[in-house]
Amino acid sequence: MTTNTVSRKVAWLRVVTLAVAAFIFNTTEFVPVGLLSDIAQSFHMQTAQVGIMLTIYAWVVALMSLPFMLMTSQVERRKLLICLFVVFIASHVLSFLSWSFTVLVISRIGVAFAHAIFWSITASLAIRMAPAGKRAQALSLIATGTALAMVLGLPLGRIVGQYFGWRMTFFAIGIGALVTLLCLIKLLPLLPSEHSGSLKSLPLLFRRPALMSIYLLTVVVVTAHYTAYSYIEPFVQNIAGFSANFATALLLLLGGAGIIGSVIFGKLGNQYASALVSTAIALLLVCLALLLPAANSEIHLGVLSIFWGIAMMIIGLGMQVKVLALAPDATDVAMALFSGIFNIGIGAGALVGNQVSLHWSMSMIGYVGAVPAFAALIWSIIIFRRWPVTLEEQTQ
């Protein structure tokens, strides 16, 4: 076995470790979607009231991503990952012990703090540790961790919550994070901060219209997605009239389809990212517009969820690739902004879905989400024609 072979295997193992970490972080972000009813019952609240926790979490991440990234810009990355995992684990212990909804929200804010730092550095670390010529595949592997959070983490968290209580779901995530932390300590080398940028990077980034256009596209399309996705569980049960088990299966199917999207992007993203993203946004638009009509059939909803999951994974990967390509001199700052903007979209979508459900009808969340999806489609066509260069090649 050659040294080069060993090095490539070690490199992939490190990327896999980051992908597992991504799975852990995204599981805890997504899992409340499947636990809203149980948490609401525990604290004698309405489901829509508990749902505001999703917006609080997302907007804390959005608000703190850039400040935390700047504060830690010179910190060695292995040490930083260890510290943020400690905060992450401690916050989940507090979630397990929560004696009131306020305490639960406080614990989730602690998780959001760790999240804010994690996603501002993970994509650039994955690219940095990937074998030569395999950077797009490394990003796809990280995205696969995200998809597995939906296909395995969210349904398993929901099942644990149903049988053992929602507190045990958060405790189990904390245990998983502890195991992941031990793996990080064992496998990761010292990772001095590189190309992290600083506050001085912001004016330079803001003067890049292509990058700003990608940020705007991101917040609009994520808002569209989360307007419907945040309340997909009660939609399936209360509007479509299907069972709780089918709701779990639908979440499983949507997440699994995300893995398909990750594979597609890994194979075609190097050459066709712009076309893939615009096509995926169009697919998302169709899925949202057909959500209510599809609610009359389990098969229709199942097929729709497959295309929905594929679309969102391609969109997420495409946005990351373009951000990294447009800011190679300040990747951490650019990704901190991306993480913050992405979470603005999550919070906005969850809030819109909340308000539609409370003051109009939950049956309308798909139609309402389709409005920003249509705007995102038009914007993507405009900006990809304005900047037609195959940006993703710059990250190779």
Swiss-Prot record:
Disulfide bonds: none annotated. Residues 36-49, 102, 157-169, 230-245, 296-298, 354-363 are periplasmic. InterPro entries: MFS, MFS_dom, MFS_Efflux_Transporters, MFS_trans_sf, Sugar_effux_transptr_put. GO terms for molecular function: carbohydrate transmembrane transporter activity. It is a multi-pass membrane protein. HAMAP family: MFS_SotB. Belongs to the major facilitator superfamily. SotB (TC 2.A.1.2) family. This is Probable sugar efflux transporter. It comes from Shigella flexneri.
